[in-house]
Amino acid sequence: HSNLRRQRQMCIRDSILTDHHEMETNSTFFFQPGVKSRTHPLTSKANQDLTKKIAKYHVKNFDNNGVLYFSGERFDDFFYGKGSTFPDINGSIGILFEQASSRGHIQNSANGLLPFSKTIKNQLIAGLSSLEALVELKEELHKYQLDFFKNSKKESNNYKNEAIIFGDNTDSYRVNKMAEVLLRHEIDVYKLKENITHKKIVYSLGNSYLIPKNQKKFKLIEAIFDKRINFNDSLFYDVSAWTLPYAFDLNFDMGVTNFKLGEKLQNIKNKKYKKVVDNAYAYLI
């Protein structure tokens, strides 16, 4: 599901991507923008301004249908690993919808009886209001996306001689799995031409890769490797960090300047490992 959605966005460059969810029964309906102080610093003001403009369409349609709703509170727009925020770092507008759940056919809630049919109707209203915004704000959305990639390219030009390096000399499998994720997101990854020692860490051929910063996915690359430890707000609804190489327990650095690019990586061929004995009494790792 998430892979198909991501592949579609890579090919089509959605202007708006809506992410429909459910929350606890005694709530109403939420739509973004979220809490202002919990928006990721790499997400532009232009993105949030457009999100607010689109929100006016939800307000109008919910008011016309007598639907209770809220916005600008509780939920944040920080973690790029979720469906409503990932588009924001890829030139689109991601919008989260949260509908109070009926948890089945019908349920009593603080706001009265909540039937399943009503929850579906509310999500439909939100979807249709998004389409209405898409049509009426077409030129603004198109310009926003063009500007996003123009500005990203312009910013990446400041790093023409800089690259990110990552690797692990003890486990190429984890390194390759990280590289697979990057390739799926159309990020240019290169093999090393020679071993590189950087900040007393040796990155060896076959166990390490280089990512030139000067490429079209500069903003996404920045988000993936960003080591963020300072926050405007101490509260989070979701996840506060997304430094992907830590998930693979890899060495990495974002500021390598003395390097030679090897062959461009096209696909990953993982080593074939011997099958673990099926009927073993125990395993020693």
Where are the regions a protein language model picked out?
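Single conserved hydrophobic/aromatic residue that forms the stacking wall/gate
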Residues: H1-I12
